[in-house]
Curated annotation (Swiss-Prot):
Keyword Cytoplasm annotated: yes
Molecular-function annotations in GO: peptidyl-tRNA hydrolase activity; tRNA binding
Cross-referenced Pfam families: Pept_tRNA_hydro
Active-site positions on this chain: H21 (proton acceptor)
Site entry (Discriminates between blocked and unblocked aminoacyl-tRNA), positions: N11
Biological role stated in the UniProt entry: Hydrolyzes ribosome-free peptidyl-tRNAs (with 1 or more amino acids incorporated), which drop off the ribosome during protein synthesis, or as a result of ribosome stalling.
Site (Stabilizes the basic form of H active site to accept a proton): D94
EC number per UniProt: 3.1.1.29
GO cellular component, one term: cytoplasm
GO BP field: protein quality control for misfolded or incompletely synthesized proteins; rescue of stalled ribosome
Name the record gives this protein: Peptidyl-tRNA hydrolase
Principal localisation: cytoplasm
UniProt cross-references to CDD domains, sorted A to Z: PTH
Amino acid sequence: MAIKLIVGLANPGAEYAATRHNAGAWYVDLLAERLRAPLREEPKFFGYTSRITLEGEDVRLLVPTTFMNLSGKAVGTMASFYRIQPDEILVAHDELDLPPGVAKFKLGGGHGGHNGLKDIISKLGNNPNFHRLRVGIGHPGDKNKVVGFVLGKPPVSEQKLIDEAIDEAARCTELWFKEGLAKATSRLHTFKAQ
């Protein structure tokens, strides 16, 4: 099983670009940069897209331009157009339950209250069995503060940790294609930015 679509979740527009909720898009932006495959807006897929080759595999990159809670529209449209199955999709998203500086791969599971994941599961026919890259952003400590927290910008010290985890996640994504998911997961899950 090869990954054919890598998605980075975000809200569109300059006012959201540096917010924690856009951590998934930061990862896809970095992959596109590392592999010299600039993202271009493609309205028919409701997002910015690019095409990369990893170890001979053709992979699409996607950052939806819909708002977060409508991410499934972009993912579902692209998956349907290219006949990509849920287990061939990797969705990168911000994760409240991991601290900044940590990122983890995961297959399947619920949406954990994440509206982007919720909409993707729905638009994939209620199938949650896609891969996720959970990018740790930490938790404000009070569930009533979550919305303001994810839509806020991390302080410089936290941003540095998040960026380092995303950099390691990009390297581990390439390792996944070279040596398999088990090896990539083992390496990523032992990483913690200091």
